[in-house]
Amino acid sequence: WDYRREPCARYQFDGLTTGYPNGEVSWHYIKDLQDYDAVSLLKSFNKNSIRNIQSAFDFNLLVRNAEREEIPIFKKIIEETGKRQGFEDKNLDYYIKLYDMFGDRADFLIAEVNPQQSIDALNVKMASLDKKSKQFHQQYQALQKKKDFLTSLDSESSNVALACALIIYTNTEATYLFGGSYAEYQKFSAPFLLQYHAMKQTMQRNIHQYNFLGIQGIFDGSDGVLRFKQNF
């Protein structure tokens, strides 16, 4: 048999799969963390990300791991995000089983703010501004707007949950499985701070690869998830 004498089979390449067929992720967005420290990592982000993270610092946000009994708080954020963005949330039992199964190989991160502590921190920052600087009035007004926003918060709790992220760790990779945030708290820039915190935690575990996981594989600017992940 001489393959050269056979008629050429005609194949057509239909392109790579886009979207999330059957809920599966075809495209991954990965950042290499090797050779970074906390300072150089932050500098590696784009200007929009750095600005948002600095704003989160101004608000004195706290990022911490949720306790098992706080999983409903975590789930509520994901649920609200799903309603807003059009995806279906898991049930509470899913999160609890995942928490129990992965143990310290999973971080259920919550970003929150204590309004009064945040106001106190802003007061200190405002008092330390250089009044002789050309940017003084602009900087002062920006911090004052943050104070006004904090004062307007109507919360019965001393700490207000803003956003969350679930990070899964293996020996070689950290994966940002999913996350969410409350739309009314977007000014806090909590999702940006969560990603920075998660990457620092990844480096502390001596893991060099951070997987943002799914993107649609559509690069015409219409994929909002990709645009967010490209900030880092």
Locate the predicted segments by residue.
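C-terminal catalytic domain of photolyase/cryptochrome flavoproteins
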Residues: 214-232
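Active-site-proximal structural scaffolding
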Residues: 160, 188-191, 208, 222
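A conserved beta-strand-loop-helix scaffold within acyl/acetyltransferase catalytic domains
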Residues: 6-187, 201, 218
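Hydrophobic alpha-helix feature that most strongly marks membrane-spanning transmembrane helices
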Residues: 198-199, 203, 207, 230
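Conserved GNAT acetyl-CoA-binding A-motif
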Residues: 1-5, 203-214
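Conserved acetyl-CoA pyrophosphate-binding loop and the N-cap/start of the following alpha-helix
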Residues: 185-197
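Generic recognition of stable, solvent-exposed alpha-helical segments in well-folded globular domains
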Residues: 69, 190-193, 224-227
